[in-house]
Amino acid sequence: MKFSDNLKAFLDMIAYSEIGTELLKVSDNGYDVIVGSTPQNPILFTNYSEHPRKYQAAQNSDAAGRYQFMGRYWIPYKRQLSLPDFGHESQDIWAVQLIRECRALDLIEKGKFDAAVTACKSRWASLPGAGYGQHENKIEPLRQAYINAGGVVA
């Protein structure tokens, strides 16, 4: 699937926010990361046929992949989007669907970065203002990650 430069940069920003630069480097660009991973102790999966659903008690989560998807949502989105597997393209398509549900695609295309992040905060706990009680990143480094990935801010 082909994505605009702004959308690709926004996806990269989400991965940066959820996983971090160092963990992206020691993994398959985040696509194989299980929640609870650190750059020093990456917890990775190798079978992309399905969401791995590896529960990590310390995080009370089974989030996995580049965009840290929860396992309980895998089957509904797999069916809705006709995803063949949990591979790179499927994860990207699923993330774009979440962005679409947040009504942020147009904001991203228009370069309204801050508004797009705010619109998506309900889907990703690491975004500012998400309110899940987890670490939330500040908007400035996320904006810089987006720009570094080729995104344009209006």
Regions found by a protein language model. Name each.
Residues 1-84, 93-154:
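Cell-wall polysaccharide-cleaving catalytic domain and substrate-binding groove, primarily
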